[in-house]
């Protein structure tokens, strides 16, 4: 930023040049000393691009100075209609921000233009070439697939061996299943054997219970079911036992009693 000021005399317009890449900010205008007709109004003008515009009006008694907020980025000319005297203009110079923005926009536009070119050159090939390349890729991929699918002799041998082993395993499994099937019939045989063994037991029970019922009818009271072994042991006693009174022992036959008495009692006599 640079301070700027200029004096514009009566009848002498002043041409102002902001400079390359610079702008001029017009901030203020004020009247100088007036020697004659102090109540006279002074009209301030600017001429830019061949057009003359009024900036404002000054009066030494009422409006001796006036503030502006005008920015010029090109050459312009200042003037006034004061007959005798001078008007002073003030402001400052600075770099042109609009020009920098325009440069940035130009650079941005150029970068935008470059992007499609690079994409067209690298990312988007011509349709014919794309078709050819795709056809080449498809043919190459097809060849690769054919090579992958074709089995070698070793693979065929291995696959046949695997099939034979699988068939052998299946046959072994089937043989095992056939051998195991007769085992399932064993429970039926066992049931038949059990039923055959159980049937005579029922007959024995029937034989044992029949005399009990006849005894029950004779007694007319509660008949206890005797154990078969106990009945068998009691039957020889009921048939007739031979007792030895001195010893208080019983024998099954007379011969046994005689031999006992001869051995024990005759020896004592």
Curated annotation (Swiss-Prot):
GO BP term, pick one: chromatin organization
Organ and tissue specificity: Predominantly expressed in ovaries. Accumulates predominantly in the micropylar region of the ovule's integument.
Ranges annotated as biased composition (Acidic residues): 98-115, 153-179
Annotated stretches, region: Disordered: 97-269
Main location: nucleus
Keyword Transferase in annotation: no
Annotated Polar residues bias: 228-238
Cellular compartments per GO CC: nucleolus
Induction: By fertilization.
Pfam families the UniProt entry points to: NPL (PF17800)
Zinc finger (C2H2-type): 242-265
Name of the protein in its database record: Histone deacetylase HDT1
Species of origin: Solanum chacoense (Chaco potato)
Taxonomic lineage from the root: Eukaryota, Viridiplantae, Streptophyta, Embryophyta, Tracheophyta
């Amino acid at each position: 930023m640079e301070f700027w000021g200029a004096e514009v005399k009566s009848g002498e317009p002043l041409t102002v040049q902001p400079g390359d890449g610079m702008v001029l900010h017009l901030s203020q205008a004020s009247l100088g000393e007036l020697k004659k007709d102090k109540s006279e109004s002074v009209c301030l003008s600017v001429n830019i691009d061949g057009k003359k515009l009024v900036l404002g009006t000054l009066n030494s008694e009422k409006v001796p100075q006036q503030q502006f907020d005008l920015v010029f980025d090109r050459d312009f000319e200042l003037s006034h209609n004061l007959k005798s005297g001078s008007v002073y203009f003030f402001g400052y110079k600075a770099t042109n921000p609009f020009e920098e923005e325009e440069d940035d926009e130009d650079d941005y536009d150029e970068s935008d233009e470059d992007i499609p070119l690079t994409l067209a050159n690298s990312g988007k090939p011509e349709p014919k070439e794309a078709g050819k390349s795709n056809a080449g890729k498809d043919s190459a991929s097809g060849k690769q697939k054919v090579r992958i699918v074709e089995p070698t002799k070793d693979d065929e041998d291995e696959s046949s061996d695997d099939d034979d082993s699988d068939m052998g395993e299946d046959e072994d499994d089937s043989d095992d299943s056939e051998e195991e099937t007769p085992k399932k019939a064993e429970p039926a045989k066992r049931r038949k054997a059990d039923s055959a063994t159980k049937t005579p037991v029922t007959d024995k029970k029937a034989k044992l219970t029949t005399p009990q019922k006849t005894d029950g009818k004779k007694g007319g009271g509660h008949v206890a079911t005797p154990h078969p072994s106990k009945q068998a042991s009691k039957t020889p006693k009921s048939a007739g036992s031979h007792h030895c009174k001195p010893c208080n022992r019983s024998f099954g036959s007379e011969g046994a009693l005689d031999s006992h008495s001869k051995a024990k009692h005759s020896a004592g006599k």
